């Protein structure tokens, strides 16, 4: 504890400037209040483009400026707004430029009912997104239940109010209490177990009930485990938690929400006097309908009696009809047989026309004809091919180089066996081969002018 901060900072004799004073005050505050928790209500919330947040934290008697810088503001899960009760943590500092005393925050969280409200809205949004509140899941309540399970505290006014309503309106209904705590942390698991056990008992409907209280008192009915246990039940459930203004997550998940436990009992307890009046009305309507039906049937019987004939006459008519049917059946049978005989004859004629022996005979005749024509055709083809060959042979002999040689000409070949067609292809002294009709001569070029080449035989 600082007994004399002025003496510690040497301020008893020294004259300071304003900047020096504010600077030393900031050091003193930050040294003493390094991390403190403060609870209050947000007001004058500002969000500049920098991402920082500035607001005033106040209670009924005082206020203090607060700064929440961007890196810490990003970690705040809930949306801040004016009027929100929060619990903040930070260090006490002083803005030297204005001499303002302020809190530099690193943590902001909802306080008291504010935290519970935010948790309520978060769970409501989560379960709603999963479809647990959809009307398609809601089951209708039985019109005339016989056995009902009541999940609530065994003591208190709630169970007495429910029993009183059933005794007055439907004393014939069997009521079964499944006792459980309805407040505190232990109540959560007890309610879940009670729901699971009641759902296995084959009740026509269940009532989940609790009397009024604060938000914290009713909080166990806003827990996710309880909500999912309600949703998992096969038995229709009426949720009656708190007073008419109280709303819980269980109310949204249940098949029906009742504003009070007594109202839940009235939903499931058919009014005996009303039922008796309805039964009387139905009895009168049934009697009138029976009388009308009897009168109608009496008239119908009288009409049938007038139309009724002696059994012997009816038997004779039936015998005559039977004889007529017998004759028609015989004629139909004979006609059918004749038609079948005619069809069989047509099929026999078609089958004979398609007999394989006839086809084979025609094919044999064609084969014999082809066998007779084949030798002559082959001779004609050979004769034609022979004549064409002779003509082509004569043409070949006319254009053959050998025929030219036979007429006294020769062919000159160079040393590579290539034919000499021009004097320009030779040179003086070149050795050539002269191919004749019969044999070859070795010659040498004496003169290769464009005039006729002079050759001489080689020795």
Swiss-Prot record:
Domain of life: Bacteria
Gene (UniProt): xseA
CDD domains named in the record: ExoVII_LU_OBF
Gene Ontology cellular-component terms listed: cytoplasm; exodeoxyribonuclease VII complex
Function: Bidirectionally degrades single-stranded DNA into large acid-insoluble oligonucleotides, which are then degraded further into small acid-soluble oligonucleotides.
Protein source organism: Pseudomonas entomophila (strain L48)
Taxonomic lineage of the native organism: Bacteria, Pseudomonadati, Pseudomonadota, Gammaproteobacteria, Pseudomonadales
UniProt-recorded Gene Ontology molecular function terms: exodeoxyribonuclease VII activity; nucleic acid binding
Gene3D superfamilies per record: 2.40.50.1010
Subcellular location, record wording: Cytoplasm
Keywords on record: Cytoplasm, Exonuclease, Hydrolase, Nuclease
Keyword Lyase attached: no
Protein's name according to its UniProt entry: Exodeoxyribonuclease 7 large subunit
Assigned EC number: 3.1.11.6
GO BP: DNA catabolic process
Any Pfam family the entry gives: tRNA_anti_2
């Amino acid at each position: 504890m600082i007994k004399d901060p002025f003496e510690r900072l040497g301020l008893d004799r020294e004259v300071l400037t304003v900047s020096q004073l504010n600077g030393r005050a900031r050091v003193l505050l930050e040294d003493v209040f390094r991390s403190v928790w403060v609870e209050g209500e947000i007001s004058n919330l500002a969000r500049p483009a920098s991402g920082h947040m500035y607001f005033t934290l106040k209670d009924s008697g005082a206020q203090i400026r607060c700064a929440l810088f961007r890196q810490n503001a990003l970690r705040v899960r809930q949306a801040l707004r004016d009027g929100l009760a929060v619990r903040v943590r930070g260090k006490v500092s002083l803005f030297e430029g204005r001499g303002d005393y302020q809190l530099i925050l690193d943590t902001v969280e909802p306080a008291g009912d504010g935290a519970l409200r935010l948790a309520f809205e978060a769970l409501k949004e989560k379960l709603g997104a999963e479809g647990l509140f959809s009307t398609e899941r809601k089951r209708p309540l039985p019109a005339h239940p016989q056995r009902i399970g009541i999940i609530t505290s065994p003591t208190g006014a709630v169970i007495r109010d429910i029993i009183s309503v059933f005794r007055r309106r439907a004393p014939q209904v069997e009521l079964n209490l499944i006792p459980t705590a309805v407040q505190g942390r232990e109540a959560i698991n007890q309610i879940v177990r009670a729901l699971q056990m009641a759902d296995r008992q084959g009740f026509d409907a269940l009532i989940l009930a609790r009397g009024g209280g604060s938000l914290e008192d009713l909080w166990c009915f806003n827990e996710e485990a309880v909500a999912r246990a309600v949703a998992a039940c096969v038995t229709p459930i009426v949720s009656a938690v708190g007073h008419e203004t109280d709303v819980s997550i269980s109310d949204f998940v249940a098949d029906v929400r009742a504003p009070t436990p007594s109202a839940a009992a009235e939903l499931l307890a058919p009014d005996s006097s009303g039922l008796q009046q309805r039964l009387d009305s139905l009895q009168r309507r049934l009697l009138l309908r029976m009388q009308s039906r009897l009168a109608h049937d009496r008239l119908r019987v009288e009409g049938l009696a007038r139309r009724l004939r002696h059994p012997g006459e009816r038997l004779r008519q039936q015998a005559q009809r039977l004889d007529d049917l017998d004759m028609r059946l015989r004629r139909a049978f004979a006609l059918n047989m004749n038609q079948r005989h005619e069809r069989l004859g047509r099929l026999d004629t078609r089958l004979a026309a398609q007999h394989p022996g006839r086809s084979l005979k025609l094919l044999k005749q064609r084969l014999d004809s082809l066998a007779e024509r084949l030798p002559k055709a082959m001779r004609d083809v050979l004769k034609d091919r022979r004549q064409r060959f002779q003509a082509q042979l004569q043409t070949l002999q006319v254009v053959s180089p050998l025929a030219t040689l036979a007429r006294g000409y020769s062919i000159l070949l160079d040393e590579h066996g290539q034919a000499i067609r021009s004097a320009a292809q030779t040179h003086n002294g070149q050795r050539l081969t002269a191919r004749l009709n019969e044999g070859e001569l070795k010659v040498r070029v004496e003169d290769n002018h464009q005039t006729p080449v002079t050759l001489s035989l080689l020795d």
